[in-house]
């Protein structure tokens, strides 16, 4: 079996893949270890042009090579901070109101994709399969094809794919979807995402969609599929139990003084519905005086993308809301919302989940939401907490034992909290068992192995006449900044 080449915007470090990172890194690393291969992408460093062009830096861990490159300031601003996170991220999360479009940022996005492709080509072998991840890399396969690469190339979109009416707000939407069609297999988190893509293909690209997700568009044939990302639930359960008596859990327990605990953990992102969540919790305190002083919401939300301006606003909004609600309902010995702006080790989070009575996960839009799955997996089967989950998380389709809410309905969310806080143990157990069965049926290994099986089954493209893997004509046509000059136009 050929090697696996994983490409993602950020590459986990070899240490992170051994457990401290999210499940994705662990899952992908598992596949890399099986076949041997390369994990290629940005190191997370902003560097000089000389250093960037000298890369990639290679680090070996058994049969796996971690290959990373630095980005120049301009690349970072245009590709990462600009088009990826100020255009694609908001639009793909249905927040056109927060999106901007700048031609030079889009040009930078394409330039960096072409440059990354050029760097990767030198590491490729003929029977490798390539698996690219997420919205930073929509044009990556097209850039590899321009370098003469004929290997199988797959893509998995971790975030929602928006309906065409939303997507067409991005001026070069057609060029982006055309680029996406250079992949051999596109994986989505949910049926809704896949349908939205098919809808675009049929109505805007005049392509065809056949049963089995077979798509023909822009002169290309490709496949699409739904692959719901999961977790390893039994490993999480074991981890949560193992650490349940550690000091941090004891400290939290003691400070709660018998109060019920609602736990929320997210990256600080406007897609996660944090302000709406705080307001729903406020509704609970307002409508149910018996819970005042008797329930605490712990919100853990470390800042991300802090140099993108919309992320500064969400931080301010949230601090304001937490302060306002706490001002209204705090007592000398009671703070209703504990809002923590920091990252926690994974094992700590899992043991805190186990200690809580409610997991409150209410994104406005989310590809899957692994926190919801982790929360369920971390529960004590004898006395499980209840998951209150947004209908707009991909996970809602599988976790049917949860209380499903609409995050725009603060009273509805408040009622779900009331119900969860007083739910009898036999109902909690029944709901937990349903959710746990879904997690076990479709764990992270199933996601990864099914996707890779389907990618390996894609018919291979005919090899280029010179048998090139980037050593042929495509790779030699270079502009000054290192991007192939046959990369698509900037806008
Ligand atoms: P994210 O938007 O990052 O992922 P999510 O799926 O919830 O969202 O994954 C977050 C991961 O980070 C979880 O494993 C969680 O435990 C961890 N995490 C969150 N807050 C943390 C904290 N304070 N400290 C430490 N760890 C923390 C994107 C998409 C999702 C999709 C995933 C995977 O937006 O929709 O589910 O990719 O495909």
Where are these regions (language model features)?
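Catalytic cores of carbohydrate-active enzymes across secretory and cytosolic contexts
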Residues: 1-491
């Amino acid at each position: 079996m050929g090697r696996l080449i994983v490409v993602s915007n950020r590459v986990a470090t070899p240490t992170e893949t051994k457990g401290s990172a999210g499940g994705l890194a662990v899952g992908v690393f598992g596949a890399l270890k099986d076949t041997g291969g390369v994990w290629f992408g940005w190191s997370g460093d902003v560097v000089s042009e000389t250093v960037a062009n000298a890369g990639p830096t290679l680090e070996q861990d058994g049969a796996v090579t971690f290959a990373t490159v630095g980005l120049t300031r301009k690349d970072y601003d245009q590709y990462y901070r600009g088009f990826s996170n100020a255009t694609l991220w908001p639009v793909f999360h249905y927040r056109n109101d927060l999106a901007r479009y700048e031609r030079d940022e889009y040009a930078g996005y394409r330039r960096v994709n072409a440059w990354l492709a050029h760097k990767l080509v030198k590491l490729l072998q003929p029977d490798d399969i390539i698996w690219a991840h997420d919205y930073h890399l929509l044009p990556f396969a097209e850039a590899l094809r321009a370098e003469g690469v004929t290997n199988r190339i797959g893509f998995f979109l971790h975030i929602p794919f928006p309906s065409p009416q939303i997507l067409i707000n991005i001026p070069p939407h057609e060029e982006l979807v055309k680029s996406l069609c250079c992949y051999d297999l596109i994986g989505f988190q949910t049926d809704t995402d896949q349908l939205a893509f098919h809808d675009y293909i049929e109505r805007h690209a005049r392509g065809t969609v056949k049963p089995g997700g077979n798509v023909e568009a822009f002169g290309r044939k490709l496949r699409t599929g739904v692959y719901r990302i999961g977790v390893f639930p039994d490993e999480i359960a074991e981890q949560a139990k193992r650490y349940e008596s550690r000091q941090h859990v004891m400290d939290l327990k003691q400070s709660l003084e018998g109060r019920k605990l609602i736990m929320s953990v997210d990256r600080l992102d406007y897609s996660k519905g944090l302000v709406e969540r705080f307001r729903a919790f406020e509704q609970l305190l307002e409508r149910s005086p018996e819970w005042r002083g008797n329930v605490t919401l712990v919100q853990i939300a470390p800042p991300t993308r802090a140099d993108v301006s919309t992320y500064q606003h969400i931080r301010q909004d949230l601090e304001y809301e937490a302060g306002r609600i706490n001002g209204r309902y705090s007592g000398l010995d009671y703070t209703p919302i504990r809002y923590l702006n920091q990252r926690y080790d994974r094992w700590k989070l899992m043991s805190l989940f186990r200690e809580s009575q409610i997991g409150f996960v209410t994104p406005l839009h989310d590809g899957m939401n692994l926190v919801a799955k982790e929360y369920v997996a971390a529960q004590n089967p004898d006395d499980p907490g209840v998951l209150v989950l947004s209908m707009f998380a991909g996970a809602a389709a599988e976790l049917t034992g949860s209380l499903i809410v609409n995050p725009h309905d603060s009273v509805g969310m408040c009622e779900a909290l009331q119900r969860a806080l007083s739910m009898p143990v036999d109902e909690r157990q029944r709901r937990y068992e349903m959710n746990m069965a879904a997690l076990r049926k479709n764990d992270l290994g199933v996601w990864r192995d099914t996707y890779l099986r389907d990618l390996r089954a894609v018919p291979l493209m005919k090899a280029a006449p010179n048998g090139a893997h980037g050593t042929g004509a495509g790779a030699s046509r270079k502009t000054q900044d290192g991007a192939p000059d046959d990369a698509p136009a900037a806008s």
